[in-house]
Amino acid sequence: MNTEKDFSPLTPNIVRALNDKLYEKRKVAALEIEKLVREFVAQNNSAQIRHVIQILATEFALSQHPHSRKGGLIGLAACSIALGKDSGLYLKELIDPVLTCFNDSDSRLRYYACEALYNIVKVARGAVLPHFNVLFDGLSKLAADPDPNVKSGSELLDRLLKDIVTESNKFDLVAFVPLLRERIYSNNQYARQFIISWIHVLESVPDINLLDYLPEILDGLFQILGDSSKEIRRMCELVLGEFLKEIKKNPSSVKFAEMANILVIHCQVSDESKSTNDLIQLTSMTWMREFIQLAGRVVLPYSSGILTAVLPCLSYDDRKKSTKEAASACNHSLMKLVTPEDDEDDEESQTKSSPPSDEAPSKKEGDLNDSLNESQESVGFSNISFFTPASSDRSAVTLDLDGIVQVLDRHLHDSSTGMMTRIAVLKWLYHLYIKTPRKMFKHTDSLFPMLLKTLSDESDEVILKDLEVLAEIASSPAGQTDTSGSCDISDSKTELHIPGSKMTDLSPSTPSMNSYFYKFMINLLKRFSLERKLLEMRGAFIIRQLCLLLHAENIFHSMADILLKEEDLKFASTMVQTLNTILLTSAELFQLRNQLKDLRTQESCALFCCLYRSWCHNPVATVSLCFLTQNYRHAYDLIQKFGDLEVTVDFLMEVDKLVQLIESPIFTYLRLQLLDVEHNPYLIKALYGLLMLLPQSQAFQLLSHRLSCVPNPELMRTLEDQKVAVKDKHLAQPHIDYSELLQHFDRVQSKHLEVRHQRTGRSEHPDRKLM
């Protein structure tokens, strides 16, 4: 430095001492400067004061020489001390050169700068608040300084500044938040610790309402929560916990909608840094749970995003039990928000609603979403779904039904989706069909194929929920439509006669079924045809559950009608055998069995005829149907025709099963009728016919023993009065043409024989036959 240069009002001795390498000499110079400035203050000579500060700043603090810079720093601090309460008038000139030295490469100089600024701030106190942002910016850099002395000095200055902010009521939070939002994305641990400590302080000041600006810093807080430092994570958890307490205490002023997407993002765990992200996910899921409960329908526009985050968590194991429980609570609370009012047209709902003005979207929301999108990449969230509200008009909160259905459908299609998640998806679909049937039926054609495919799921519970959804689709009045087109029924096999309204009016108690009922039955049978393992393993289970969920009579009537036109005769026979077993053995079919047992009404006779025509695909099932309906003479006539059929091992096994059924509680009434030989001769003849069909087997012995218990076998002859009795019984069933039914049986069995012979001719392994 040129010592001959004029630095007045600084004396040459002061200038020389300020440039000295010894701290003690620079300190003496500082005391001289302090005395000089005090004189100027006493004289109210502000021009000279500014001149001194300018010289110290430009010629010393910003000098190229390190010792000069040190002298300038201590000199500026001395000026501040001399100015006292008047230092506020010169703070910019005092602070700026000191902050510049924060970037110096010399750690000792950075320490002196920190010391100088401490003295300046200590004197000015609240007057420094207008310059808070530049002070905070400088301190945030020193917080990550590698030198421990500098870091220690910055901590002292930091504590002083926090005390000033805490005791003041003039802190400009609006001006500070943009800087805070920028700095909160720092990856440096010390910088993060510094940021968190400041948020904690500001949050604790009663006059500072940081909650209003939480949407702008919440994303950054969740990213800090994923820090590798346990201490930083603990501090961040504490801050987030305090914010959540404040939210729960005063929910009316919280901008829930602006923070919903932030939580959606952080509720979804990326693969990177999985252990820390688990904490982020649990915390954000806890927040989401509280938000849904506190904000209610305000979060509905974000429901698709919430479900994207929540649904996968429902399949977590006990290692993430807390997250799973929080997700379950979110899911349950969100589901409760959907009401029948959501089924109204948007125009209707808007005219009815008069929401509070505080639900209007913030102007900053778009900018916030942009910053969120940018920040995702830095923390491994680049592949995570981000959702925008269903409607930008928050004045009328509407359900994002299209988005929800899209999310649910995607989870059903994903083979990796866990069982509990699949169950939750199906519960959602069922709930939506109950609450918003009119809107949901617009999505039914796209959902229907996947719902049918879900019947092949490994879990019984999933299948049960799936059947509930399908049953609701099939029975909902909202599904009434004139269109007969179906999802996934382009195959010629499924171009069947869809029963009209008369088919649904089988009995006064039969509920009306919509067009999807028949589409469902057609597609269900088609699926059984394509997946024989499904029919074998789950067919009876599925049909029995449907009989509980829907009207059993409708199910059997429609399936019989469809099977009547089935071209795959082998499948038709197998399906009839399955349906017949269900009809005869399932507790769910008790009422239907009673309806068929007597055939006293026109409706029951019509049902019998419908079932009979399809049951003809399986001769033994047809006989068992006749036994159930007490058509013993017709059963006997059918058994007489068995001699013309191709008797296979499978056929005899079915006869064996029928004998076992006759011994079961289902046919108790039939066995008791054996006591009345006089009025049931054809029952006995039919049973003897079965006996003659059987080889010498256990079933043969069983039936033979039963028939040996029949009293007075000589009375089995058909007498004239018995013919009258039988005739009288048939007169009670005027709607059944038994001769025509017998002819139909012959035609169906002829087709089966023809197909069997064709198959035998093409195959080297024909059906097993008895020679």
From Swiss-Prot:
GO terms for cellular component: endoplasmic reticulum; endosome membrane; PAS complex. One of its GO terms (biological process) is phosphatidylinositol biosynthetic process. HEAT repeats lie at residues 5-42, 89-126, 171-208, 212-249, 442-479, 550-588. Its main location: membrane. SUPFAM superfamilies: ARM repeat (SSF48371). Residues 334-374 are annotated as: Disordered. It is found in: Endosome membrane; Microsome membrane. Keywords: Endoplasmic reticulum, Endosome, Membrane, Microsome, Repeat. It comes from the Eukaryota. PANTHER family: PROTEIN VAC14 HOMOLOG, TAX1 BINDING PROTEIN-RELATED. Belongs to the VAC14 family. Scaffold protein component of the PI(3,5)P2 regulatory complex which regulates both the synthesis and turnover of phosphatidylinositol 3,5-bisphosphate (PtdIns(3,5)P2). Pentamerizes into a star-shaped structure and nucleates the assembly of the complex. The pentamer binds a single copy each of PIKFYVE and FIG4 and coordinates both PIKfyve kinase activity and FIG4 phosphatase activity, being required to maintain normal levels of phosphatidylinositol 3-phosphate (PtdIns(3)P) and phosphatidylinositol 5-phosphate (PtdIns(5)P). Forms pentamers. Component of the PI(3,5)P2 regulatory complex/PAS complex, at least composed of PIKFYVE, FIG4 and VAC14. VAC14 nucleates the assembly of the complex and serves as a scaffold by pentamerizing into a star-shaped structure, which can bind a single copy each of PIKFYVE and FIG4 and coordinates their activities. Interacts with NOS1. The C-terminal domain (residues 523-782) mediates pentameric interactions and is necessary for the formation and maintenance of the PI(3,5)P2 regulatory complex. This is Protein VAC14 homolog. It comes from Danio rerio.
